[in-house]
Amino acid sequence: MPQSLKILQSLWTMQNLRSGPDATLRQNIGRIADAGFDGIGALWIDRAAARETAAIARGHNLIVEGLALPDSIDALKPALEWGAEFGLHHLNVQPNLRPRDIRTAIATLEGWQQLAAEVDFAVNIETHRGRLTNDLLVTLDLIDAVPDLRLTADLSHYVVGREIELPVSAETDVYMRRVLDHAEAYHGRVASAEQVQLPLDFPHARPWIEQFKTWWRYGFDRWRRRSGPDAELTFLCELGPQPYAIAGPDGRDLTDRWAESLQLREVARECWR
């Protein structure tokens, strides 16, 4: 089979949608499958929940990206064990620690790499605010120290976290592309310098959508060049509920995040072509 882009929908996105009260896990996964997504993104922090989620997804022929939040080397072990037992396409790790000494950060990443070598699915480290990878420049230092570091690229966190403005400076673009050179999976969301999640249909979002498309095209191309002929790249549509989503005076989301997820899927497909 040729290289392919697998587009996933986040179960987190399915919370508090404008379309009505929250559905059950089974209903949400069924809706995602019926809409033609290739898989789901799910929390992977509880054994019983992981088992149930994996079983329902498997029944719909959906792949699963698990999300773990370990705060130490050993804290990653349960998520790996559940992935091996129940089945994962890959595990996404938000490193829930914030050491001031980069040597501690490097040792933790190397420890996780050793554990990841024992399982038959990929393990990626997410670029995320409030985590080990909180700062773009620190993440670049980590890449220097751990050159085979596998990342899940969620660029929205760096755009808003560093208040990156348009037009993006040449220096910042080089930094972002270095992150993309290590991206083995993507989380899809469009941010601006001041907002982590822009409504996709609002006119002021258009320049930022174009910027993210430029980055995603670059990252997809680089991934294709270095990956095997039948490799799979994943793109998770991850439009979070409030406070990520912007609310109106009635307390409801200003936009329909389910419809936006379908729109974002088409953007990802466009960037892949």
Annotate the PLM regions:
Residues 60-151, 160:
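Active-site acidic/histidine proton-transfer and metal-coordination neighborhood
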Residues 3-15, 40-42, 62-68, 91-93, ...:
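Hydrophobic faces of well-ordered beta-strands that scaffold small-molecule active sites
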Residues 1-84, 266-272:
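N-terminal pre-domain/capping segments
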Residues 246-273:
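Short, low-complexity, polybasic intrinsically disordered segments
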Residues 16, 160-163, 190-204, 231-250:
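Flexible glycine/acidic-rich beta-alpha junction loops that bind and position SAM and/or redox cofactors
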Residues 118-203:
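Acidic/histidine-rich catalytic cores of soluble enzymes
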Residues 174, 208-232:
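A short, acidic, amphipathic alpha-helical segment used as a generic capping/interface helix at domain edges
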Residues 25-30, 50-54, 76-80, 106-113, ...:
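Generic structural signal for well-ordered alpha-helices
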